[in-house]
Design a protein with these regions (language model features):
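Pocket-edge positions in alpha/beta enzyme catalytic cores
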Residues: 11, 39, 80-83
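Thiol-based oxidoreductase modules, predominantly thioredoxin-like and allied folds used
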Residues: 34-45
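Short, solvent-exposed polar/charged micro-motifs at secondary-structure junctions
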Residues: 46-50
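Local sequence-structure signature of Cys/Sec-based thiol-disulfide redox active-site neighborhoods
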Residues: 1-29
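Compositionally biased, disordered extreme N-termini, encompassing classical targeting presequences
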Residues: 1-4, 99-103
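Short, glycine/charged-enriched secondary-structure capping and boundary segments
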Residues: 20-23, 53-54, 72-73
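Non-catalytic, surface beta->alpha helical segment in thiol-disulfide oxidoreductase systems
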Residues: 63-100
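Structural micro-motif
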Residues: 51-60, 66
Length: 103
């Protein structure tokens, strides 16, 4: 079974580029074990539809990378990471945990 990654972002938040690069590094060699979808959130309506936690957000099998719950009122906003954007190592570790759990 493949692990599904959903990368949610919007262009108005500059941190999505760094996280997208970290994600690209994190998945090297795992391409046959994952499927990835990039979701561009363009407005408040689409933010509500995807239950947007802010840009950038990575969902792994529908769960937030850092366990952030779905907000009561999703909106088009930049996401604040108190410890900074997740590193490629942190992302890879979380993906591998899901892969190992699924198998």
């Amino acid at each position: 079974m493949r692990v599904k990654l959903e990368f949610q972002y919007f262009e108005g938040c500059p941190n999505h580029i760094k996280m997208q690069n970290n994600l690209a590094e994190a998945i090297k060699g795992l391409e046959d074990k994952i499927e990835i979808e990039k979701v561009l959130v363009e407005d408040e309506v689409s933010a509500m539809q995807v239950k947007f936690r802010g840009s950038p957000t990575l969902l792994i099998n529908g769960e937030d990378l850092l366990g952030m719950p779905v907000p009561e009122e999703p909106s088009l906003a930049c996401r604040y990471y108190p410890k900074g954007i997740p590193t490629s190592e942190e992302i890879r570790k979380a993906i591998l945990q899901k892969i190992n759990k699924e198998n």
